[in-house]
């Protein structure tokens, strides 16, 4: 009886002691981390106070711990990247911090705390950008997600401020990148309802627009500016041009860019170009004419690829070949929706057609205007002064020159007449003076003779 009684009373005590020795294993917590980044593995105390703890690897090697007011650390060679947040211990939090994550860090870590075991599963993933995060306009970017073989294709989603959202599992590609796609992309990897976000900085190098068009009247200067975000890139450039009436394209100018300085290598003399020596690339034609109207391609060759920019030049010319005809002509690439309009200034359109050449017969004298418009937008306009009927430009020029010549002849005759009159006046004055002197001399001689005769008597 005594021995039975003793056993019945000792059994609860033995179970109580055994419960203190047993370590309770709980469910695993999953933590995601990106290669090269940091990860924080949680371990919380229910008492919310400082306590002894130990972090161990899956093979039971001690990484670090705290016991009897002493900090315990494992092999420095193996765990130099591992640490904890000591200022959180007083609050009952004992996290394991792993810096500069490696793919081989993916494993199960065990936190022993208050006679309990907390298992934390760390999944480290690697993101590969092909061909990189600095690309040329029009190129494609492929993002590949590598993770632990045990993980089956975790989904990834990337967002950009341009409202681009790309979703896929393990890998995705973005095609025909634009300059607007440059900037910070926020990507999120999801696994077992756990999410890890990281930023991707993407730089897309290229032109601000895929094509530019200049609308100019004949005789005006045309300027083409090519804003680029190339940084310190070096390149070779060429502008090839095909005039509207030319059978084929030709090289207009070749140049190079090195250390932010532009150097012209070869250029045509007709038209004559002016190229800026610094960025942004600026190309100027001092005087355009109908023969230059057309389109071309600016090609920039860089180490990482080739960039293209379409360039268009539309030229307008308004002429009055004779007194009975007014002509407006446009050459260069225009939209089928564009319309040519001829009208007198501040009046209704006389002619309005979707053609490149329009005419007005017997135009009234005054200021005439030719406009090239697309819808409500006027792309360009040019003005001309129309002379009265029967007085064309040649006649007007002849009249002006004749009048000028007549004026010069009249002025010359007036000057000659004035000089002659002056000469005559001077000659008359001189003759008058001579007569006066002669008169005075005769008077003196007569007086002398009379005095001499008187003396003889």
UniProtKB/Swiss-Prot annotation:
Quote the Gene3D superfamilies the UniProt record gives. Answer: Immunoglobulins, transmembrane domain of human cd4
Q: Locate the Ig-like V-type domain: which residues?
A: 28-127
Q: Where is the Ig-like C2-type domain?
A: 128-206, 207-316, 317-374
* Alphabetized GO MF terms: coreceptor activity; enzyme binding; identical protein binding; immunoglobulin binding; interleukin-16 binding; interleukin-16 receptor activity; lipid binding; MHC class II protein binding
Primary site of residence: membrane
Lipid addition sites, S-palmitoyl cysteine: 418, 421
Topology in membrane: Single-pass type I membrane protein
From the record, give the cysteines joined by S-S bonds. 43-111, 158-187, 328-370
GO CC annotations on file: cell surface; endoplasmic reticulum lumen; endoplasmic reticulum membrane; external side of plasma membrane; membrane raft; plasma membrane
Q: What does this protein do?
A: Integral membrane glycoprotein that plays an essential role in the immune response and serves multiple functions in responses against both external and internal offenses. In T-cells, functions primarily as a coreceptor for MHC class II molecule:peptide complex. The antigens presented by class II peptides are derived from extracellular proteins while class I peptides are derived from cytosolic proteins. Interacts simultaneously with the T-cell receptor (TCR) and the MHC class II presented by antigen presenting cells (APCs).
Q: This protein is called what?
A: T-cell surface glycoprotein CD4
Gene transcribed to yield this protein: Cd4
């Amino acid at each position: 009886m005594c021995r039975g009684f003793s056993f019945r009373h000792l059994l609860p005590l033995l179970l109580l002691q055994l419960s203190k020795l047993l370590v309770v294993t709980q469910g695993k917590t999953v933590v995601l981390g990106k290669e090269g980044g940091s990860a924080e593995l949680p371990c919380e105390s229910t008492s919310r106070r400082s306590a002894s703890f130990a972090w161990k690897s899956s093979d039971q090697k001690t990484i670090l711990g705290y016991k009897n007011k002493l900090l315990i650390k494992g092999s420095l060679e193996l765990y130099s990247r591992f640490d904890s947040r000591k200022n959180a211990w007083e609050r009952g939090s004992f996290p394991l911090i792993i810096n500069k994550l490696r793919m081989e860090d993916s494993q199960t870590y065990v936190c022993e705390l208050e006679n309990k075991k907390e298992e934390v599963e760390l999944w480290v993933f690697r993101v590969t950008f092909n061909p990189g995060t600095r690309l040329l306009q029009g190129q494609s970017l492929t993002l590949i997600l590598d993770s632990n073989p045990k993980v089956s294709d975790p989904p990834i989603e990337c967002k950009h401020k341009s409202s681009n959202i790309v979703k896929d599992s393990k890998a995705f590609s973005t095609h025909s990148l634009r300059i607007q796609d440059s900037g910070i992309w926020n990507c999120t990897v999801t696994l077992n309802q756990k999410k890890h976000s990281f930023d991707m900085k993407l730089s897309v190098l290229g032109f601000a627009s895929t094509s530019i068009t200049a609308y100019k009247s004949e005789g005006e200067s045309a300027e083409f500016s090519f804003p680029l975000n190339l940084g310190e890139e070096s390149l070779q450039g060429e502008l090839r041009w095909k005039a509207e009436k030319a059978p084929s394209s030709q090289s207009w100018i070749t140049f190079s860019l090195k250390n932010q300085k532009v150097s012209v290598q070869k250029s045509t003399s007709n038209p004559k170009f002016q190229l800026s020596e610094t960025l942004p690339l600026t190309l100027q034609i001092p005087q355009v004419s109908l023969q230059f109207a057309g389109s071309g391609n600016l090609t920039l060759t860089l180490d990482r690829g080739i960039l293209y920019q379409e360039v268009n030049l539309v030229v307008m010319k308004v002429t009055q070949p004779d007194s009975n005809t007014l002509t407006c002509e446009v050459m260069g690439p225009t939209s089928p929706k564009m319309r040519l309009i001829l009208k007198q200034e501040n009046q209704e359109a006389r002619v309005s057609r979707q053609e490149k050449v329009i005419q007005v017969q017997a135009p009234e004298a005054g200021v005439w205007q030719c406009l090239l418009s697309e819808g409500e937008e006027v792309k360009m306009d040019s003005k001309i002064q129309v002379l009265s009927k029967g007085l064309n430009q040649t006649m007007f020029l002849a009249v002006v020159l004749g009048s000028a010549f007549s004026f010069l002849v009249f002025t010359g005759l007036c000057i000659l007449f004035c000089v002659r009159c002056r000469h005559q006046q001077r000659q008359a004055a001189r003759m008058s003076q001579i007569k006066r002197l002669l008169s005075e001399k005769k008077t003196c001689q007569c007086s002398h003779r009379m005095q001499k005769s008187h003396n003889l008597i």
